[in-house]
């Protein structure tokens, strides 16, 4: 009897206090975990994944810091010169000459190019060269066939505004940042609060060499956002000029959608770059690349519905639904509407899983 403690006395022991503190911590962790929405942003290279992530930051009012804008400023310069270098290399490969022979004098600038220091204006000798080269019909002939050579699709946006970009006081606008290309290597995480939940979005490198790293993000994923460029139906891969972007995306979606890792994971399909797709179908035949397409090549609605159906048919699980949306990652207002619907889908499915 003397060895027995009353309930009141036992509450004062260090062991009891540690146990109660541990219980509180577990409950708090469970509460935080239930509030966390973990999204995996996947897709083949050039699909616009990183642009979607940047648009989400704008939508949810996560500003770009001064340091980030400075990094993007220097990236814009690299986008300008590397895009032109791609075209010049293809001109040599395809034996295409300059219309204006004097443009040969600019080639030395693209053997190597300077690293832009912090706050250093872009070199003005490149402004003259880029203007001259962009107007050359030899350059334009390659640009018009850019789908065959993985020419960046942001070039026309930047090259129509070179004077602004080369201004000594230039600071990238949100539109400049959205269109700035920077190959995703490894895993980039972005976190933001929304509707009493914390969203953690992981952008994973899309090129083939990056895909082996995806495995580290698979556990406890709430949803997969899979991004595909509709405009890639006639385009080659950056890393493999003999492979088609859309075919690559279809194969990748098949493996992701039907993976054991995602058996109970919501699958959100972003059919992206609808703006570029609408322009392309006016002159680039879908049937040439996808002979089973039986619609009018220039029928925008029929064409995009065809590709939506191609992806949805890959789902082999009767218990899994695909939620497709047509997007333009550089149109923040459109993406805001799409993301509102996506959020409803994710939270509804999340609640269903908790109940089950």
From Swiss-Prot:
Q: What is this protein called?
A: Guanine nucleotide-binding protein alpha-2 subunit
Cofactor(s) required, per the database record: Mg(2+)
What species is this protein from? Mycosarcoma maydis
Q: Which portions of the sequence form the region G3 motif? A: 199-208
Q: Where is the lipid attached (S-palmitoyl cysteine)?
A: 4
Its gene name is GPA2
Task performed by this protein: Guanine nucleotide-binding proteins (G proteins) are involved as modulators or transducers in various transmembrane signaling systems.
The terms describing its cellular component in GO are: cortical dynamic polarity patch; cytoplasm; heterotrimeric G-protein complex
Residues binding GTP, per UniProt: 46-51, 153, 178, 184, 206, 272-273, 275, 329
Q: Which BP terms does GO give this entry? A: G protein-coupled receptor signaling pathway; negative regulation of pheromone response MAPK cascade; positive regulation of conjugation with cellular fusion
Q: How does it assemble?
A: G proteins are composed of 3 units; alpha, beta and gamma. The alpha chain contains the guanine nucleotide binding site.
State a single Pfam family of this protein.
G-alpha
Enumerate the SUPFAM superfamilies for this protein.
P-loop containing nucleoside triphosphate hydrolases, Transducin (alpha subunit), insertion domain
Q: Which UniProt keywords apply?
A: GTP-binding, Hydrolase, Lipoprotein, Magnesium, Metal-binding, Myristate, Nucleotide-binding, Palmitate, Transducer
Binding annotation for Mg(2+): 50, 184
- Chain spans, region G1 motif: 38-51
Q: Does the keyword Electron transport apply?
A: no
Which family does the entry's similarity section mention?
Belongs to the G-alpha family.
CDD domains according to UniProt: G-alpha
Q: Which residues form the G-alpha domain?
A: 35-356
